Amino acid sequence: MLTKFETKSNRVKGLSFHPKRPWILASLHSGVIQLWDYRMGTLIDRFDEHEGPVRGVHFHNSQPLFVSGGDDYKIKVWNYKTHRCLFTLLGHLDYIRTVQFHHENPWIVSASDDQTIRIWNWQSRTCISVLTGHNHYVMCASFHPKEDLVVSASLDQTVRVWDIGALKKKSASPADDLMRFSQMNSDLFGGVDAIVKYVLEGHDRGVNWASFHPTLPLIVSGADDRQVKLWRMNETKAWEVDTLRGHMNNVSSVMFHAKQDIIVSNSEDKSIRVWDATKRTGIQTFRREHDRFWILAVHPEINLLAAGHDNGMIVFKLERERPAFALSGDSLFYAKDRFLRYYEYSTQKDSQVIPIRRPGTPSLNQSPRTLSYSPTENAVLICSDLDGGSYELYIIPKDSVGRSDVVQDAKRGTGGSAVFIARNRFAVLEKSTSQVLVKNLKNEVVKKSSLPIPTDAIFYAGTGNLLCRSEDKVVIFDLQQRLVLGELQTPFVRYVVWSNDMESVALLSKHTIIIASKKLVLQCTLHETIRVKSGAWDDNGVFIYTTLNHIKYCLPNGDSGIIRTLDVPIYITKVSGNTIFCLDRDGKNRAITINATEYIFKLALLRKKYDHVMSMIKNSQLCGQAMIAYLQQKGFPEVALHFVEDERIRFNLALESGNISVAVASATEINEKDHWYRLGVEALRQGNSRIVEFAYQQTKNFERLSFLYLITGNLDKLSKLMKIAEVKNNVMGQFHNALYLGDVKERVKILENAGHLPLAYITASVHGLTDIAERLAIELGDNVPSLPEGKTPSLLMPPSPIMCGGDWPLLRVMKGIFEGGLESANRGAVDEEEEDVEGDWGEGLDKFDVDGMENTDIEAILDGAEAGEEEDDEEGGWGLDLDLPPELDTPKASANARSSTFVTPPQGMPVSQIWSQKSSLAAEQAAAGSFDTAMRLLHRQLGIKNFAPLKSMFLDLFSGSHSYLRAFSSSPVVPLAIERGWSESSSPNVRGPPALVFDFSQLEAKLKSGYKATTAGKLSEALRVFLSILQTIPLVVVESRREVDEVKELVIIVKEYVLGLQLELKRREMKDDPVRQQELAAYFTHCKLQTPHLRLAYFSAMTVCYKSKNMATAAHFARSLLDTNPTIESQARTARQVMQAAERNMTDATTLNYDFRNPFVICGSTYVPIYKGQKDVACPYCTARFVPSQEGNICSVCDLAVIGADASGLLCSASQVR
């Protein structure tokens, strides 16, 4: 049994499969009807209008309807699309056992405990016939799939077959009173429209179920006498064919399988039994421990069954439907219907090759599981689960393709798996011993090899190599050298798919796809909520795979997406261009055409084939929010711009890609304050002051505009802005602008007009405007404020602008392919808008709408000032001074024009970038400023995930490898890279590695200080020193292999000290728990410390145990202490005294979790011993050991790495990567 779906609920009494959709109805003893999607495993809906148990339920085969019958005597017809009951049919006088729709007519048949069967017309909502004759509860009634017959089963120990042919001749909807009267009579006494054709007697107790065969004139029944009976009928009679015995309790339900010659029954004995309908013998039995079975349902189209029991229901298959196949170049070999078949992709020709199983062999769940093909020897290995695992070897004659009469005796053997590993060699797995037998084509063993892990399946992994699968990992094993070439932790792998060049492999689990290299180096992992069924590599290195309901793709970086949906599951065999070749569950070859544009586009982006990307943008119909979001997420907003017409999205993408011109055009179309504000922020970031000015004008942000004019030295526009503030009666704005301009008279005037005469007087007096000050003093009279004495006034004037700046100078670079590629298509619209906008920027102040004034009044103010300026220019006559308007300061030169202006040379590659590209050491990446690369390297090499302790070290490395040269105040600081080992004779064209602030000698000095602190008993300080060393080591670089070994040795030394000091500090905290104190002190002695420190540990443990009356344990520590030949006499004397005291009473007062005779390591988190033979996990960096429950947590010893993570190992020298 292959369970596909299972639910937990109240007792399930009725089940019905939907004929087309992956749905199943389950009616419960609690009165609820559940609608489940068994493919997705989700509850779609529930219907709960019945009162009491619902025993019967059935889907209509074409309408969105289902019918239910319950213990409330009601039959309800429901519409599952509208989620409501359409109507209720009343007439039965007792519990309703089953209900069923007719396959053609608008009829429903129902069976009831009132000893009748009723046939209803659900369109006219009336009962059209009552079938009476049973004299006990009618447990079941169903229509024949083709003929006008009904079969019923009753507790009166009979099965009856009814002829309902006369019903078709009557009107389904009675109209007049006479017909209503006859209807009432038929309700009471039974009508003549349905007559009993056969009464089948043979059961000794009540019959619970009877059903027709879908095509043959057979009936099967199950009863309380624990028997299943098979009946045959013809036009005149029906008779018993055979009795199937085996159930130990009442048989609840029994049915014929829709596709195979088998009978399935279930019983209250908690079992489901499968019987061969031809041989009438039992084939398989499936049992549950606590659940009695009550109902069966068979899917009318596909190989699915369902069974309801006391605590829910299960949907299951009896055997696998995945065909076994093997690909070889342009051809496919696959097994179907006891034949090996051959399919050629180019011609799509399908033919039989040879028979592969003798007729008469039991076939249930013993079909071929895997198939392996050797093209050189034209040999096929077929594996199945027969006899616990077996294989058959066939040599295909060259002239047998297309012929199916060539019979040969296969060479057979037992084994869990069998695959070809060379031209004329194949490997067979012996599961019990985890051995591989290498055999030749004569089926003779030529070699035996033990596998490195307990293996339950083997797969081909290249010539002479095997991929071995265990429960939680896979390894690649070289049979010749007996070496493990690669290992990878995975969920349970079901299928293995190699790429065409054997460089990549896809490992398919139930819900996971793992892409790895040929050495099992992980590339990406993909998780699916729906079961993964198959997959194949296309020509571009993209993995195409199927789930139950989708064809999907997986790119090399792990990005995935849906190509198309599926109606039924398929098994991909090959992908060629836009065609997917696959096998369906019937073993038929199919070719499906797909649209590969989306994943080819993403692959081109991933591989940086930008010319290909541009070509696809121009020629393909790529669109959709998902594509835009993908491009944005992957850092290509400038590409996404080409797919977007919505101005708001275009604006966001333009800002993200820094495309100011497109952003201006979109902001002009949108014309909202928030968008202008964001445009101003981005333009300010780019130093484009003209667009910043324009954006501030559009938002009427006078304060920011004033400050912009101040910092760019544009005093003319600042004075115009002051006039506008005066017109708007904005006193604060006017005063600010006067302050920025240094216009004292204007400030005095503003203060006077605002009524602040004392402030105006002080301002005038301080700045030496005596005439104005005297006039104001007269107006103030006796209230003239006095100026402070004894202080020398200083003039507060803003500095005069030396450079009236425009936009920041930018390096001239070539336009990117995505910016210039579509210029011809988009130039017209965008450039026209841009030119219009640029024309307005020079005198953009005209745009303001001032409260209380017309635009023409403001323009008059501003135009007056400009007219005066123009007159002044004209008075110059024919002078050589030419004042150009701002718009013409930097004219646009034509493409071919020669310019005399200085063009900044293109910037070379920064040294930090050279460092980053050349180095694979994390410390040098951090020194180059590539922190993210450094973190990725540390994560891959050492499994480090917690980078907080390394943050300050990263910053130290970066700042220590750079120096900064300051020049003039107006010029930027010049960064200089400091190289390791630089000398005056070094070549200027060769860049050395960065200088590093951490080296191995520093760590050795720190180690000595840590030893000193430990000896002095300053344990907290010592722990801090050792932990600092442990966290610095990943960022140390050494030169030679010998130094690499010393660094690795230092990691172990420091790890032992950190763990030991943590144990001792923890012990000192636990003053209220003497048992735990003794345990921690005992564990401390098992840390590998220097001899002086080990003596201190022994002495401490001896003292603690002696005080707690654990004399035997104390004596052990005293003996260990004396074995180290202590140099301090007091320690030796105390140890001898303890041993003398212990000899008188060699017992322990308390039991400790400590056994010094059994070797162990200490868990670095829970501080408990992990004895030899127990499972543990390790920190990939410091190698500290932990109990398995700590896997996935941050290591508590080094505080850096993830416990149990995969890591390649410490890389601290360039010599390791040469």
From Swiss-Prot:
Chief location of this protein within or outside the cell: cytoplasm
Compositionally biased spans, kind Acidic residues: 831-843
Coiled coil: none
Subcellular location per the Swiss-Prot or TrEMBL entry: Cytoplasm; Golgi apparatus membrane; Cytoplasmic vesicle, COPI-coated vesicle membrane
Keyword annotations: Cytoplasm, Cytoplasmic vesicle, ER-Golgi transport, Golgi apparatus, Membrane, Protein transport, Repeat, Transport, WD repeat
GO molecular function: structural molecule activity
Protein name from the UniProt record: Coatomer subunit alpha-2
Species in which this protein is naturally found: Arabidopsis thaliana
